[in-house]
A protein has these predicted regions:
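Extended catalytic cores of very large enzyme megasubunits
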Residues: 1-800
Length: 800
């Protein structure tokens, strides 16, 4: 082979040293089986990518990409790639090292320097280095060995999305620096900030829980906008509309996700008395929000985004449903803002009875937005009588079932608008003493009141369930309890520390101290336990886990209230009356006049907790289950409560394109001695194992993918969790059918089972692209292309 020189970071050249590379690969294989064969495999394939003048950065990337090409054959290569990427991060930020002990010492030595330098450059808050923290003690706690818990996608996601960078874009944080920076940034107000930061760090660095994206990006930073979710309701006047655009821009800039309610805006054609003209209606103003989202720079890490909400009695609701359609007037379409419909029980009952549904101009029916449950139904019927008697300027009516099908047809085509239920949200709310909840947030899991003086905010952490399941398939309940309580305290601290340039958001945050503790990794733990997602065992486990976490989250908030005081609007809340989330199920049944079909069995001492919460609660809300798409990558687990989308698929993210192979499936098939013989067949079937002979039925049941499960399983899982969750749940739906009548049944069942919200609808594609693999004749490639500067796949043969 022609001599190859490597250009080092200082510009000097040195001959390519295969032994040096092989040693690095071997070290990355530590603890894995067949280490030598893995090194040989990677080293052989690496030869094809080398060229004279390759830089050390290019060489590092070439090694990693070569390793990743083999993930399809053995997921162990993902671990190797993660370790190699981590080594490049360490070298770039800390310098060279040889042993794990040296790496730990480098972390301890460099962390205080990093904090002080970042504060000096204005990247970190001055409080990080003002003496309240013992930086040496914190640095001594850093444990880079915990980075080995991460998969490759987790490492690259943290590096590209969450790690602190200089203004020139160069990263200055290792993963453990990131964890500690976040822990410190959420401990300023503790009596012993160092001890608190160490506790938070230990939970986060062990991936027991992960804060929401905005917190990960901004904690400890010079402008700590840490809240994840913002909910604002637009009033029917120009000042409110203009302010909503401004507020949207500020929130998006700070990486927050936004829910925006537009139901109050008068309909198109409605008189505008001040100018003696007619209103253009809410749709053009929604377009303004959409444009603002596109225009704002969002730190280049975590994109800000919004969901626009409207109740379906609005006269312009038909145009609202079309907002996400690809065709039509572009000025009446939103390309960046999502849409969601806020649905009343009255509408769902009319769908069931096949009755008419009336649409009104909010200018003539302004109180409907503030009413819910029985009060809404009574007032709505009064407006119907007024309309039919000619006492309203304008109205429209359609069969309720027809409108429902219209919504669901759009949902099938565009995955919008998402379906959320106003009355279920408000009747079951424990914090509705401060007003009506008019909408949810970007991801449909936050349910907080908002008005002109309050832009509701919520702060998120998600518990990684898989971190508490032992190898022997037992649960570490004590550690889960500790993590839940620590997460609540961490989130409560966040309420005092977070900043935003919007006074109404700061006011709401201080008045409610709302937090949302969620879960992720459900599908991951079900697979490890051998439970099918649609089994009774799975449903009971979801029930048990969410009850346990809810109980200890509520208990911790009550303890914090005793220590620090209740949130300011506690008096008059459901909590102050000793009402808990599980108690509101009967309240909802009474309001509907029909029993909500939710299993209400309990396992813990809820009577004792009822007495305790009457005395005080630190937070208006405690739980909300977010989708966790990105922080799930960081934790190396499955998102939220979703099933596996597929066992093998290509994932495209802002961080690149990655091949995802279900490690649990590979592990189980390896135990049965089936993986090596069947992996090609599994790839040919695009990861679908249901029709592959030789795989036991129990394995097939456990590894059903989202489109192979009954949609009623998604509803059952969410219903079991929702009874314990005081806010809501991001419930993605996956349907194989395109029958709209079946959609009506499914979403009606979701309402009957007490779900507060749903999120995206994913419909199984009609066609799947043909898969190919690339087989390379390595010997021919090396012999013939020896004079080529860049080697690649010139002699590749396509296998179909």
């Amino acid at each position: 082979m022609k001599e190859i020189n490597v250009v080092k970071r200082d510009g000097t050249k040195e001959p390519f040293d295969a032994n040096k590379i092989n040693t690095a690969i071997l070290k990355a294989c530590e603890g894995l089986p067949d280490q030598i064969s893995k090194v040989v495999q990677v080293a052989t394939e690496l030869q094809l990518t080398l060229f004279d003048g390759i830089t050390t950065e290019q060489l590092d990337e070439a090694v990693i990409q070569t390793v990743l090409q083999n993930v399809k054959d053995d997921p162990d290569y993902d671990k190797i790639a993660a370790r190699l990427l981590l080594k490049t991060v360490y070298k770039q930020i800390l310098g060279d090292y040889e042993t794990a002990e040296e790496l730990k010492k480098l972390h301890a030595r460099e962390f205080p320097k990093f904090v002080k330098a970042a504060v000096k450059e204005g990247l970190l808050d001055k409080r990080m280095a003002d003496g309240r923290f013992d930086l040496k003690k914190l640095a001594a706690e850093l444990d880079p060995a915990r980075d080995d818990l991460s998969k490759y996608l987790g490492v690259v996601t943290n590096k590209n999305r969450y790690a602190l960078r200089k203004q020139n874009g160069s990263p200055i944080e290792t993963p453990q620096f990131t964890h500690m920076r976040i822990a410190m940034g959420l401990s300023y107000n503790e009596s012993d900030p160092t001890t608190a930061a160490i506790e938070f760090y230990n939970h986060m660095s062990n991936l027991e829980y992960v804060p929401g994206g905005s917190t990960r990006v901004n904690a400890g930073g010079s402008f700590p906008q840490l809240s994840n979710c913002f909910l604002l309701n637009v009033d029917d006047d120009m000042e409110s509309i203009a302010k909503a655009v401004r507020d949207t821009m500020w929130i998006a800039k700070g990486t927050g996700g936004i829910g925006i309610g537009f139901t109050k805006l008068r309909a198109a054609g409605s008189p505008v008395k001040t100018t003696n003209t007619e209103s253009t209606g809410p749709i053009p103003f929604m377009k303004m929000i959409d444009t603002a989202l596109f225009a704002v720079s969002r730190k280049g890490k975590k994109a800000g985004a919004a969901a626009i909400y409207m109740e379906n009695w609005h006269l312009n609701f038909d145009q609202f449903v079309d907002l996400r359609q690809n065709s039509g007037d572009p000025y009446l379409r939103t390309r960046f803002a999502n849409t969601a419909v806020f649905i009343s029980d009255e509408f769902m009952k009319r769908v069931e009875k096949d009755q008419d549904w009336y649409l009104f101009d909010p200018a003539e029916t302004p109180d409907l937005t503030e009413l819910y449950g029985e009060e809404f139904s009574a007032r709505y019927k009064e407006y119907i009588k007024m309309a039919e008697a000619g006492k309203l300027r304008t109205f429209d009516k359609v069969p309720a079932r027809q409108q429902f099908k219209r919504i669901l047809t759009s949902l099938q085509a565009t995955s919008h608008p998402w379906l959320t239920w106003k009355d279920t949200i408000n009747v079951r709310a424990l914090n509705n003493n401060t007003g009506t909840i008019h909408l949810s947030n970007l991801c449909t899991e936050i349910t907080l009141p908002q008005d002109k003086n309050n832009i509701a905010t919520c702060n998120l952490v998600s518990i990684n369930l898989s971190a508490f399941l032992s190898e022997d398939k037992t649960w570490d309940w004590d550690r889960l309890k500790e993590a839940a309580r620590a997460a609540v305290r961490q989130l409560d601290n966040l309420c005092d520390i977070t900043q935003t340039p919007i006074p109404e958001a700061m006011h709401s945050n201080q008045q409610t101290r709302a937090i949302g503790l969620g879960i992720m990794g459900l599908s991951d733990v079900l697979e490890k336990l051998g439970y099918c997602y649609e089994s009774k065992e799975a449903y009971d486990l979801v029930d048990q886990l969410t009850e346990f976490i809810s109980y200890h989250a509520i208990d911790q908030s009550a303890d914090l209230a005793k220590e620090l005081g209740s949130y300011p609007t506690f008096a008059g809340s459901g909590w102050s009356k000793g009402i808990l989330p599980i108690d509101t199920v009967d309240k909802l049944s009474k309001d509907r006049g029909v029993k909500v079909k939710i299993d209400q069995k309990t396992r813990l001492d809820w009577d004792g907790l009822r007495k305790k919460v009457k005395k005080g609660m630190r937070n208006a809300t405690l739980m909300a289950i977010a989708p966790t798409a990105n922080i799930g990558h960081v934790a190396g687990t499955t998102p939220g409560i979703d099933p596996q989308f597929a066992q093998i698929f290509s994932r495209s993210t802002l961080n690149g394109k990655f091949l995802e192979v279900n490690h649990n499936l590979v592990r189980d098939l390896k135990k049965l001695g089936l993986w090596d013989n069947l992996k090609d067949e599994i790839f040919a079937a695009q990861g679908d194992i249901q029709d592959i002979d030789g795989i036991p039925q129990n394995i097939k049941d456990v590894y059903k993918t989202s489109f192979q499960l009954s949609p009623y399983a998604f509803i059952e899982v969410a219903a079991r969790a929702q009874k314990w969750v005081d806010q809501a749940i991001s419930r993605n739906m996956y349907l194989e059918t395109r029958d709209i009548d079946e959609y009506v049944k499914i979403y009606s069942e979701a309402w009957k089972r007490g779900l507060k919200t749903t999120y995206y609808l994913h419909v199984k594609p009609r066609h799947q692209s043909e898969q190919t693999t690339v087989s390379v004749d390595k010997i021919a490639e090396q012999k013939v292309r020896t004079n080529s500067k860049v080697r690649g796949f010139g002699f590749a043969k396509i296998n179909k």
